[in-house]
């Protein structure tokens, strides 16, 4: 086939890769893959052993590859215990965060080795890789095998496309998301916090460097501008607006066109229909709540119910049994409030005002008109679903990007952010009442504003598919064949030229030096001559 007779948009094989990430990481990637499949592309999925279930509901996935071992139950519990203990305000808490990240990245050697074997086989080699940000071995595969890559991020990548008006480490700030309303002292504290984080991550950096050295690879410094496609599952309105290079695009919220409905047998429909102001509570499927936090949450909800701000609670809680078996939780108060709540009755679903469910159809609940509020850990999916369905949020983030999402929701005027470690039952009840009563109407106004923005942006998942095709088709003709097999003939069309220049050339520093010299030298000579002549 000649170039002139070639297809304009040929079908290709796309490999989606999700390793240590879970449903929240896989769902948006598979939704984009669904769109690509409707355009004629073949979709395959690579994951850890035991995570095949993430792709099995999707008939368009033609093949599943296992590229690593599963995480054991003990490892899983240990990991999320580390996350729960992490705290940016203490040195030990910051180290805990990077120990958890180090644990995630300990899968890199195995996934890199297995992905390398996979793509080395001509039968399995994909034409494009769409990966979760935690599957960072895919970046090495891209560099080694010249397979174009897109990486999915739940928020703007921390070290890419920095802006001077965004203080500290973006996504990990102490207080302010931008410098607009930050005092000079607060901006200084944000920069000092960066130094604290860098000091805390030194073991993590050495761990990565040694791990890569053992695999025969050098260090991979994070780029200020990517040389692969970056798909950010967020949107400006939550994220601070900033200029982005062409290879970085916001595509969120990536939402499936349909979602599970409430089963008639669950009693949820009757529960919601018989009430007008129900709060939905969910902290994700992996967060383990300590007993003291459960007591304060129940006390706060009980106070809000007693005040009439809400008339029902639906709590999605995968496994309340460890708390139920904790006699202290069941029989005593938290020592702060005077609540006499029967925790045992609540946890056993014997309080008719509060429904605890092992699994709940989250989007169906958020979409119901009786749901007036969401008490959330602010995971990536939960944040987007709350905004998309127009439900205000009491944010109680636990770790990672949840902390930034809590700040973003509050900054957008659609929620109140609370600290998971020092909140009180009274404070929780007051914040619930403040949002539900909405005396000045600003919460409702901002919720509707952001919902409309999110709805408009939710169509950008098709733009993500467009951009993947664009980069894929560009890449396969940028590299030579025949005698020039694998030789890069030209750079990717979306990469700005300054990414391939030295800092001196890109900033025109050499040009400025020459211009200054052209002016300074004649002036200097003239001054010297004038001194000689008039001496």
Curated annotation (Swiss-Prot):
It comes from the Eukaryota. Changing residue 104 to M: Does not affect the catalytic activity and does not lead to the ability to perform O-glycosylation. Optimum pH is 8.0. Keywords: Glycoprotein, Glycosyltransferase, Membrane, Transferase, Transmembrane, Transmembrane helix. The chain crosses the membrane at residues 506-526. Disruption phenotype: Completely abolishes the production of stromemycin but leads to the accumulation of the aglycone of stromemycin, named bininalkenylresorcylic acid. Its EC number is 2.4.1.-. The transmembrane domain of is critical for its catalytic function. It is a single-pass membrane protein. Stromemycin was found to show antibacterial activity against methicillin-resistant Staphylococcus aureus (MRSA) as well as significant protein tyrosine phosphatase 1B (PTP1B) inhibitory activity. Moreover, related O-glycosides show also significant anti-HIV activity or alpha-glucosidase inhibitory activity, as well as moderate cytotoxic activity against cancer cells and thus are promising candidates for drug discovery projects. PANTHER family: EG:EG0003.4 PROTEIN-RELATED, FI06409P-RELATED. This is UDP-glycosyltransferase stmC. Glycans are attached at residues 70, 422. Optimum temperature is 30 degrees Celsius. UDP-glycosyltransferase; part of the gene cluster that mediates the biosynthesis of stromemycin, a depside C-glucoside with two unsaturated C9 side chains belonging to aromatic polyketide glycosides. Acts as the tailoring enzyme responsible for 3-C-glucosylation of bininalkenylresorcylic acid produced by the combined action of the HR-PKS stmA and the NR-PKS stmB to yield stromemycin. GO terms for molecular function: UDP-glycosyltransferase activity. InterPro entries: UDP-glycosyltransferase (IPR050271), UDP_glucos_trans (IPR002213), UDP_glycos_trans_CS (IPR035595).
């Amino acid at each position: 086939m000649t170039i002139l007779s070639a297809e304009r948009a040929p079908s290709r094989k796309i490999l989606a890769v999700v390793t240590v990430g879970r449903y929240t990481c896989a769902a948006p990637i598979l939704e984009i893959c669904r769109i690509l499949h409707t355009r004629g592309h073949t979709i395959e999925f690579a994951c850890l052993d035991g995570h095949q279930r993430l792709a099995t509901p999707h008939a368009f996935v033609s093949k599943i590859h296992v590229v690593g071992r599963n995480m054991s139950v003990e490892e899983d519990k240990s990991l999320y215990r580390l996350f729960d203990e992490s705290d940016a305000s203490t040195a030990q808490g910051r180290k805990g965060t990077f120990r958890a990240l180090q644990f995630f990245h300990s899968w890199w050697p195995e996934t890199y080795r297995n992905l390398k074997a996979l793509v080395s086989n001509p039968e399995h080699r994909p034409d494009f890789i769409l990966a979760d940000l935690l599957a960072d071995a895919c970046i090495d595969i891209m560099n080694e095998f010249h397979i174009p890559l897109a990486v999915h991020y739940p928020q703007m990548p921390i070290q890419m496309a920095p802006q001077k008006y965004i203080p500290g480490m973006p996504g990990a700030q102490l207080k302010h998301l931008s410098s607009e309303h930050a005092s000079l002292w607060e901006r200084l504290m944000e920069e000092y916090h960066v130094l604290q984080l860098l000091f805390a991550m030194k073991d993590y950096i050495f761990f990565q460097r040694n791990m890569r050295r053992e695999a025969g690879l050098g260090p991979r410094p994070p780029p200020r501008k990517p040389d692969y496609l970056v798909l950010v599952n967020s949107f400006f309105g939550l994220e601070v607006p900033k200029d982005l290079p062409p290879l970085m695009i916001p595509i969120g919220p990536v939402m499936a066109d349909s979602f599970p409905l409430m089963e008639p047998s669950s009693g949820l429909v009757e529960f919601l229909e018989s009430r007008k102001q129900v709060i939905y509570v969910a902290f994700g499927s992996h967060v383990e709540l300590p007993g003291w936090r459960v007591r304060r949450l129940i006390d706060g909800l009980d106070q809000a119910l007693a005040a009439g701000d809400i008339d029902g609670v639906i709590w999605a809680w995968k496994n309340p049994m460890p708390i139920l078996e904790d006699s202290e939780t069941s029989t005593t108060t938290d020592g702060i409030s005077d609540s006499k709540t029967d925790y045992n009755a609540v946890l056993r679903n014997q309080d008719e005002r509060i429904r605890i469910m092992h699994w709940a159809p989250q989007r169906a609940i958020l979409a119901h008109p009786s749901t007036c509020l969401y008490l959330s850990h602010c995971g990536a999916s939960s944040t987007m679903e709350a905004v998309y369905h127009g439900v205000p949020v009491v944010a109680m983030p636990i770790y990672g990007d949840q902390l930034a999402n809590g700040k973003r929701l509050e900054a957008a005027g659609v929620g109140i952010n609370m600290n998971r470690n020092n909140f009180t039952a009274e404070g929780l009840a007051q914040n619930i009442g403040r949002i539900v009563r909405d005396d000045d109407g600003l919460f409702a106004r901002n919720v509707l504003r952001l919902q409309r923005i999110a709805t408009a942006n939710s169509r950008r998942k098709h733009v993500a598919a467009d951009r993947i095709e664009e980069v894929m088709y560009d890449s396969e003709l940028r590299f030579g064949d025949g005698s020039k097999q694998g030789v890069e003939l030209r750079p990717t069309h979306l990469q700005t030229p300054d990414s391939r220049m030295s800092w001196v050339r890109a900033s025109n520093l050499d040009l400025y030096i020459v211009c200054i010299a052209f002016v300074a030298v004649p002036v200097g000579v003239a001054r010297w001559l004038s001194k000689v002549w008039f001496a």
